Amino acid sequence: MEKERIIKLSELPQGTNCIVKNVNGDAAIRLRLMELGFVENEPVMVIKNAPLMDPVEYQVMDSHISLRRNEAEKIDVLVTDDTPESPLNVINKKIDFESFELRTCPDTEKCCNEKNAGKKTINVALVGNPNCGKTSLFNHATGLREKVGNYSGVTVDAKVGTFNFNGYSIRLVDLPGTYSLTDCSAEEKYVFYFLSNCKPDVILNIVDASNIERNLLLTTQLLDMGIPVVVALNMYDELVSRGDSIDYKTLGSLLSLPVVPTKASSGMGIPELLKTIVDVKESDEQHLLHLDTSGLNVEEATAYRYRFIRELLNKVYKSGDKAKHRKAYNADKILTNKWFGFPILLIFMWLMFEATFTIGSYPQEWIEMATEWFGALVGSWLNDGIFRDLIVDGVIAGVGGVLVFLPNILILYLFIAILEDTGYMARAAFIMDKLMSKVGLHGKSFIPFVIGFGCSVPAIMSARMLENRKDRIVTILTVPFMSCSARLPVYLLFVSVFFDKYQGLILLGIYLVGILFAVITSLILNKVSFKGVSKEFVLELPPYRIPTVRNVLIHMWDKSVQYLKKMATIILAASVIIWALEYFPRSNGDDMLTDNNIEYSYIGKFGHAIEPIMRPCGFDWRLGVALITGIAAKEVVVSTLGVLLDAEDEDVSLKEKIRSIDGFTPHTAFGFMVFVLLCTPCIAALAAIRREAGLKWAVFSAVYSTALAWIVSCLIFQIGNLIL
């Protein structure tokens, strides 16, 4: 006989199957859980606990969702001895498809008039769930290279691309991923506002074919907007490969909209999709249908829509082998294992830094030799004088000192691309949530932190994925303590000079110091400014995917172009300005650049003025000036040293000149790297903080981090002197 009992979802052990009976809690969390699939009569399976036993991974509607135990406690479930049926076969009340109240959109005439007004331009809004392949499709269609990744929250604002197709100019707007059009998050509000006010000609709804039931919830809401909808059934190859099948033509007929199967990562189906958009634009009739949910509250409407979707899929969808469904998550048996999860994460991080230094050192040496050779060659062509000094000591020494670290930065971005594209980024957040919540940080904050290893600006912007303002602000203010790639040239330079035997470990140590002070800052902010409770940890764990070589190479190429552009603009300008400030004023007839001249130059006088502040940290005036110029961009620290130390002997490498600085010891060098790590973010990052959090927090970040950098570096130097 079947045994049944009602229990809290949080109380179930791993491997238990159950059926949702009720969702409790406040309205916002109830709605979010329902949108993710936790609706009445929906089967759920408890997959596993995180290594620290919280959060917990659940399978619902062919997706894997991470919930903290206090969130899972809000869900009442029915446990049976039998494995629940497929959700497509579990419907609490059998209904006929025709019983759903579908009607023609009252705004059809208005939409058609707006459509005809801009005959040669089609405005298309790209809408879909997070991580459904929107941005990949956007890149293939437009030829642009926006960031893609296998985790939710990659797109944080609207991206626009325009291209020509069949005589039309198609303006494609990639909107942030959203589970619905309610107002549970900033992304949902943004998407709803855009669709309501900008009125695109066509909504291109990207539906993840491998998780179609949940994705169609958004589709039913888009049908209510009064705008023609075209559905791209993306990742169609994954659906087929696991033995599932769907009659997408019948699906389109029942929804009164065109459905086109696609594979955005390779471009499959995109030409047909664009042709369908043009056909919709040229069509004289637009039969826009939607569900009549009048008289229902938001939660009732969500449940009603899922009933409609279940009945719809019963007509067109056939599920294959469930073992193939689980195949995409098999790696979790090891990567998020109770015993192996943390060690594997730490090993990966160490490997990233070790490879960045070890592998990158070979091309770095080649570029360094080429730069020195080129500088000597140009110097031999030019006559002694101001112009020669500008080119050799200013431009080549300054820009060349930064150029040599390009291979290391590309290797770092290679590892970050692998983290993002495989889906491991979300697993890292899953593993770290319990630990991070103890120090006042949200588990999702780990994603901006890892992005921050590349650049603080997109990392700060990605904090928008956090729904709670407190979590968002704390994350934004702690992200700059992650060592971005702009700081990497400084670390690599000093590590190679003073820590040759332990390069990988010292580099990892610097990154860990940044994480440590991010934690300390979070604790301070939570104690002083933010005393509220963090938002719930609701995170989708995407299936593992093998990164495409194309996406990884594009990611690395784009970063190299950005780096080279920065060298051709900010770093070049800074190098020339620093050279001019060190070159002038000059006495009559004195055209030689010597250490004595630099002492009395404009920059020398400025450096000596701030030297009393820097001396307690063990830094002379040249190091102090380099730190100040690093506010423009952290790479400028290296180019500044390249200019300031290139005085009399052009044949000696920058590393040798740094090693020869009086009193500059390994612990002083470590303190200098920590100062670069902790001091005020660059101008671009401060602007991002101001835009995302406000002027007050941008000023706080600059002042607090600079004071912290001085105190910590001073302690390292003074304690080091006592011990060594």
Residue ranges and their predicted role:
Residues 481, 485-508, 684-694, 713-724:
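Transmembrane helix-loop junctions at the membrane interface of multipass transporters and ion channels
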Residues 361-395, 399, 439, 460-474, ...:
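Extended, low-charge hydrophobic alpha-helical regions
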Residues 344-354, 412-417, 495-497, 511-524, ...:
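Hydrophobic core segments of alpha-helical transmembrane domains in multi-pass membrane transport
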Residues 163-166, 190-259, 490:
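Conserved C-terminal guanine-recognition region of P-loop GTPase G domains, centered on the G4
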Residues 239-287:
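Canonical P-loop GTPase G-domain recognition
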Residues 314-328, 380-388, 539-554, 595-599, ...:
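Short, membrane-interfacial amphipathic segments enriched in basic
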Residues 101-180:
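Conserved G1/Walker A P-loop phosphate-binding module
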Residues 369, 373-377, 381, 426-456, ...:
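Juxtamembrane inter-helical linkers in multi-pass membrane proteins
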